[in-house]
């Protein structure tokens, strides 16, 4: 056989090698029973998606290191912060902090140069708890968080994050207390439960993904300038004397590519508004979400009258008594089917480039 013929045969073989391309533009299904199979079909392991993923991420995932932590300090390091300190700046490989069950009473910060870190709870039925009681009075609002992540490609699996500071009573100055601040890009959270009152989750900036999570709070308990999808996640408004406000998204202008997307979620608890116009062009979308009768009929709050023409608070095919649109504020828009198909997808956070399924760590 000639060299030309051999080359032709090899080319033919290569053309028929299957390459898995993650189509993150496919709309998220309305039926919650289909979510997992749909997600697993799109967000496959890195080994079959190398062609579409960030090259540096592909390299990092091939060199994973596991650090074991125990709440009594008998793991590879005595504390979470010691373990993080051991990771070099400009880290280029995945480092998995694997937590045994128990309480970890620390205020933890991952700096902006410590990329590719995973917090992994070994037992999803007995999840490790990160807990601290920082407040705005002591640290400032965004720095009060129990866990602060400023680096890229962070992931958390099977974890509880708690700010144990007391509920604000309207009298104490600086009583806000965040549990989590995520300021890095391309972060994912699977089966993570986040507890606080006012300002529980600072979804600060970057593209983020939450699946099968639980977030509770009172006032503005999800706030910031992130561009994030919340999928199959429970939003629990802690009952109190005043209605809760779930979101305070911080988009200032129409040109900013940020916003929160709640898809196939559940809103539970006491009386609540879905959000308020903290900033002039705040953008929050609720779709296929179960809303109990705790939701105020108007749904949303305008902080300033002039925000009426600039905020974007669309809703699409939500369910339950709280989803009734008859008494919604007049600035609330119903998405059309075409608009929903275009915007309610993993493509809005470019998931095909970076989002991976939750890591499963095999331990001896």
Curated annotation (Swiss-Prot):
UniProt entry keywords in alphabetical sequence: Allergen, Aspartyl esterase, Glycoprotein, Hydrolase, Secreted, Signal
A biological process term (GO) from this entry: pectin catabolic process
PTM description: Glycosylated.
Pathway: Glycan metabolism; pectin degradation; 2-dehydro-3-deoxy-D-gluconate from pectin: step 1/5
GO cellular component: extracellular region
Keyword set includes Manganese: no
Annotated InterPro entries: Pectin_lyas_fold, Pectin_lyase_fold/virulence, Pectinesterase_Asp_AS, Pectinesterase_cat
Coiled coil spans: none
EC primary class: hydrolase
Enzyme Commission numbers on file: 3.1.1.11
Family to which the UniProt record says this protein belongs: Belongs to the pectinesterase family.
Name of the featured protein: Pectinesterase 2
Species this protein is from: Olea europaea (Common olive)
